[in-house]
Amino acid sequence: MGTNQTQISDEYVTGNSSGVGGGISDVYGEDSATLDQLVTPWVTSVASGYTLMRDPRYNKGLAFTDKERDAHYITGLLPPVVLSQDVQERKVMHNLRQYTVPLQRYMALMDLQERNERLFYKLLIDNVEELLPVVYTPTVGEACQKYGSIYRRPQGLYISLKEKGKILEVLKNWPQRGIQVIVVTDGERILGLGDLGCQGMGIPVGKLSLYTALGGIRPSACLPITIDVGTNNEKLLNNEFYIGLKQKRANGEEYAEFLQEFMCAVKQNYGEKVLVQFEDFANHHAFELLSKYCSSHLVFNDDIQGTASVVLAGLIAAQKVLGKSLADHTFLFLGAGEAGTGIAELIALKISKETGKPIDETRKKIWLVDSKGLIVSERKESLQHFKQPWAHDHKPVKELLAAVNAIKPTVLIGTSGVGKTFTKEVVEAMATLNEKPLILALSNPTSQAECTAEEAYTWTKGRAIFASGSPFDPVQYDGKKFTPGQANNCYIFPGLGLGLIMSGAIRVRDDMLLAASEALASQVTEENFANGLIYPPFANIRKISANIAASVGAKTYELGLASNLPRPKDLVKMAESCMYSPVYRNFR
């Protein structure tokens, strides 16, 4: 071969077939190798040093040693200094903190991910509390709105109506074969921002970066997908920079057939055990897809099930503060879409299992308000099917404040996607009814939150137990510091995904979501409670995810839905051993 190239041999494949690092075959020996063992960084059958530096999986930037530079023909292509990964991390964080605009930070991080994958994930893991609002909510919402303008390089797989009849061929274009997790969106309901069409790709990309950083699933096992069936957003259709199909959304039979082809192709290409997470689909499609495919595929809807699980975890944890069981509470929701009804159903299921009462009876303690007012029996015939179980006997009530005074809830939960709907009068009414009102303003992004942390603490005179969907800064009130909790799905889905992969699950069941909720609630300490928190700090997220994965895995084995046999003796250790490490490897 030429002097500037390296010949690859078939002997490079190492590691056992079961694999670690997120449950896929360890093709490059990167995770089965200890940190001081050498791995071979070949990208293609013949790779030059120049190519090596431009592959984000293997690029180490200025961390290539002199020996590695000589061996892989990099000498002279980099400045002479050799920097450790820790120094590189400090440098990048210093540069990120110079940006005052969150979107600029987001773009800088995405650029890093496309240049140096391991440094990106090390940065995210070590600085999760600071960077989580950048790579995900709330900043990712703005990134999706402006995705056409900031688009640089393709991330993920785009499957549009133009590919109808050949989706399997498109899936085979993706270079990685051992896919374990797919996050897919059709962009119709991105956060609280509505129909962003093809520009919703930022959501699957962001979610999967968190599957890796927080749950330890290997980046090469993750596949972000956007299904482009058009958009009804006129601004995007008239925007010359829009990157998707410029046509109205397909619906009805055309939509159903396209999704059917997609789901069949996924199963055919990646097998029975690939986890498909539906993300930010509109209500009418989200419930239908989950119901249709839950018995034939390993599917999960984060908006319905992930949100439900994380909220239930907060409610379980809050029992220690309030001294009440879930069955003692009365719940009132503002918002009766995917999130609201999903949370309500999981709460009802948990109470049913605790009390032995039928779920139809436990639902009666849970009330929902939609855009037309309180959901009551006389509205049942006109309600969408997923709202009908929540239509209880009561006279019609139009306004939220009137509903609070009529129902007298102990817990107020906002999933409306409409900001400032928990008004001063509503929050003060909750404080009048309860010594410690539990208020969850869950809508994302921050601008769509039903109320702010400061408003909740001020209007209840510091008595509220508060959590939100997007982050809020600590609040000083009456000489005391209150730290608002964040009911972020990121607590649940990375550990849940790892648990499903680790056990070789073939289906997702509600009992697994309950197990995840209980595992998360168990991680809240007395110190957290003293600071007003009902969720643990994100700084411990990998430990939290390992515990959730172990609980989900245990439940999967218990239900007979696990295929990785025999069951490991210590599931927590198994989860920790499966986690991807972003530390640089030494190359031969």
Swiss-Prot record:
GO cellular component: cytosol; plastid
Protein encoded by which gene: NADP-ME3
Gene3D superfamilies: Malic enzyme, N-terminal domain, NAD(P)-binding Rossmann-like Domain
Record EC number: 1.1.1.40
Residue numbers binding a divalent metal cation: 279-280, 303
Binding site for NADP(+): 189, 303, 332-348, 444
Assembly and oligomerization: Homohexamers and homooctamers.
Organs and tissues of expression: Mostly expressed in flowers, and, to a lower extent, in stems. In leaves and stems, restricted to the trichomes and trichome basal cells. Also present in the stipules flanking the base of the inflorescence bract leaves and in the meristematic zone of developing lateral roots. In flowers, present in pollen and the abscission zone of developing siliques.
Family per record: Belongs to the malic enzymes family.
Name of the protein this chain belongs to: NADP-dependent malic enzyme 3
Annotated site (Important for activity): 303
